[in-house]
A protein has these predicted regions:
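Short, conserved active-site loop motifs that form the nucleotide-linked donor/cofactor pocket
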Residues: 31, 51, 132, 199
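Short glycine-rich anion-binding loops that position phosphate/pyrophosphate groups of nucleotides
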Residues: 8-9, 58-59, 97-99, 178, ...
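Short glycine/serine/threonine-rich phosphate/pyrophosphate-binding segments
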Residues: 12-18, 74-84, 91-105, 116-121, ...
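Phosphate/nucleotide-donor binding subsite
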Residues: 48-89
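Short beta-strand segments
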Residues: 6, 36, 54, 94-96, ...
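N-terminal phosphate-binding or glycine-rich loops at protein starts, especially the Walker A/P-loop
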Residues: 1-41
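Glycine-rich phosphate/nucleotide-binding loop
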Residues: 106-120, 126-130, 134, 214-218, ...
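Glycine-rich phosphate/diphosphate-binding loop of Rossmann-like nucleotide-binding domains
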Residues: 32-34, 40, 141-203, 207, ...
Length: 260
């Protein structure tokens, strides 16, 4: 496998990306990394056989406009994506602006033939330890029922090929488990998903079941998916904060935390 790594576009610059690439190369020496960025900032990677440095003199900043990425063809982000377009790599990793990366992907890599809309996917940890793919999590504010069916097929394939799940369970995020729940779009999406022979559709799923681990792929419109993702993130932060405060509230808790 070959991966292109955008080293420059993240909030913290190239330093954490360089360290991550070094650790990844140690664990996965059979994977080739093509790291795009300013050559002088990537010298620590030069001695690693599985890593190739691709010099890129420009950077897509977090403050850049989404459409401004088209003017930065010499940036580390665009150079990494162009390698994917030319089939020189199998995938691209970037810590840069989500909006800029999504737009650049549409401009320079294009969509798979037959796919009407692209989406963003998040892999969620669950109670059971079984990861769940949630999509769309914000690429589109609105979606059609047909697009949700596309997301379901793509998510199912990802779950099979990347997460090695034999027959991934696919569910539709909705306001109730019954097939008649939701607005017109969600009811139509339910019918399309139920009739799709390319996926293992198990029905509607409510937000409270999102992290149960009972479903492998959950599809939703980008607006709802983004809210669901950020609500989950907020709940996780709250839980960690509460646990920390509880642990350090007593001397016994502090001692226990040292050995945890």
């Amino acid at each position: 496998m070959k991966l292109a790594i955008d080293a420059m576009s993240g909030d913290l610059g190239s330093a954490p990306v360089v360290e991550a690439c070094k650790k990844f190369a140690e664990r996965h020496p059979d994977v080739e990394l093509f790291v795009t960025g300013k050559k002088e900032e990537l010298t620590a990677l030069e001695s690693i056989d599985s890593i190739h440095i691709v010099d890129a003199r420009d950077v897509v900043l977090m403050t850049d406009s989404v459409l401004g990425v088209r003017r930065k063809k010499e940036s580390s982000m665009v150079k990494a994506l162009m390698m994917a377009r030319k089939d020189e790599v199998d995938g691209v990793v970037s810590c840069g602006s989500t909006g800029a990366f999504y737009t650049a992907s549409m401009l320079f890599v294009k969509r798979i033939e037959g796919v009407e809309k692209s989406c963003l996917m998040a892999t969620l940890p669950t109670y059971s330890g079984n990861s769940t793919c949630l999509m769309d999590v914000g690429a589109n504010a609105t979606n059609t029922a047909e697009q949700l069916q596309e997301f379901a097929v793509m998510g199912s394939l990802y779950s099979k090929l990347v997460l090695d799940k034999k027959d991934p369970k696919v569910a539709l995020l909705n306001i109730g488990a019954e097939d008649h729940k939701g607005d017109e779009m969600h009811q139509e999406a339910y019918k399309l998903l139920k009739g799709c022979d390319k996926i293992n559709f198990t029905g509607n799923i409510e937000g409270r079941e999102l992290l149960s681990g009972d479903t492998d792929v959950v599809v939703t419109d980008g607006f709802s998916g983004n809210i669901a993702l950020k609500t989950s993130e907020g709940a996780a932060i709250l839980l960690m904060k509460a646990m920390k405060e509880s642990l350090f509230a007593t001397l016994r808790g502090k001692i226990g935390a040292l050995f945890a």
